[in-house]
Amino acid sequence: MDRPANERTSALAVYIGIVQFFFAVTWTVYVVYLPQLVEQAGIARSWVPWILVADQVVFAVVDVATGFWVDRVRHSIARLGPWILAVSVLSGLAFIALPFMHASPALLLAAILVWAVTSSALRSPPWALLSRHAATPRLPWLSTLTLTGTALAAAASPYLGMALRGVDPRVPFLLSTLTLIAAVGGLVVAERRLVANSPAAENLEPQPKQQVVLFYAALLVMALGFQAHFSLNSAPQYLRFATPADLAWLLPVFWIGFNLAMFPASRVVGRLGALPLMAIAAACGGLATLGCAFAFTKPLLLSAQFLAGACWGAASVAAYTAALRFGRTGREGRFLGTLFAVLALAALCRIAVNPSGLAAVAEFKALLPWLPATAWLAAGLLLIAARSPKRS
């Protein structure tokens, strides 16, 4: 691809990153207000975690189905952008309706289901769109640009949660939806500029099935470790040295490391390969999570959290690059959909810890500080086993 084409592809990745940012913001708004919404609809707040678990189940199933659908229609649909925009508008209408669905539990749950199903248009399809127009050597860099949006939203979520206290839910639901749809509109325009300048299709050999299976198994194990570390362990670790009010300023350190590490990682992927980089990141990240568990000063904890975030950032760039390369045989959708489904399953397991009563089990409490490191090191071993003579 020539330089102008590369610039247009980078612009498309930036637009997708912006879409991912605003999509992640809508999820934060949803989680913040869900207890209030279910209570207004006559549902006990104790059901909130199970509703979130159900959301993740829907995400996992629909993401895989959407991925296969994208692969099936890739030759019959010239541009994915308009389809993504149309489904996003439907998803946005369902999302805006949530604060008004207090007449009955059934209405609220139906609106949540519609939103959960249609929001799949904003996960794997934009990535498949990017893969359609990108040359293989640029995938790590473009993945980094896209993931930056998600990382920034994750870093901002504690501040957003504080800012939304006492705000009428109808306001953030409306504003977040409008900004998201506007961002998707920009994505449509960016895609239109690229259609006439797309790279020729690359006929790469499919990866060995065993390697693909081991990759997704490793990703699931590593994602479980990430969920245990960041969502279950990080706050208690910080509270050894800080107050609850400080958490909003301390938790984003992980995501700062994540974001900064992605940029050099995008270059390392091209030299080492995606799976070897994931394995190295998993091993280093496992040691970093142990450092978090046993840090005896606040500066040491902050440093270990930063390093853990950096390792997860490098692993994420490698994972998305690997999934995109696995799909370069015309099956980008299914591999990306499976990646998002794996991440949803890991989130599901983390959310279910508290309502299932597992968090109160003494044995689980004793093992929890060790779980992230164990999971990440196990993922590293799976990735070593998955490595083939050819780079992923």
Go through each PLM region and give its residues.
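Helix-loop boundary and gating motifs at the non-cytosolic
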Residues: 2-59, 212-218, 222-240, 247
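Helix-to-loop junctions at the C-terminal end of transmembrane segments
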Residues: 62-78, 261-274
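A membrane-interface helix-boundary motif in multi-pass transporters
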Residues: 79, 162-179, 354-376
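Structural signature of the two symmetry-related core transmembrane helices
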Residues: 80-96, 276-291
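Hydrophobic core of transmembrane alpha-helices in multi-pass small-molecule transporters
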Residues: 94-98, 104-122, 300-314
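Intracellular juxtamembrane helix-capping segments at the cytosolic ends
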Residues: 121-134, 314-328
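C-terminal transmembrane helical hairpin of 12-TM major facilitator-type secondary transporters
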Residues: 275-316
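A late C-terminal transmembrane helix in Major Facilitator Superfamily
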Residues: 330-360
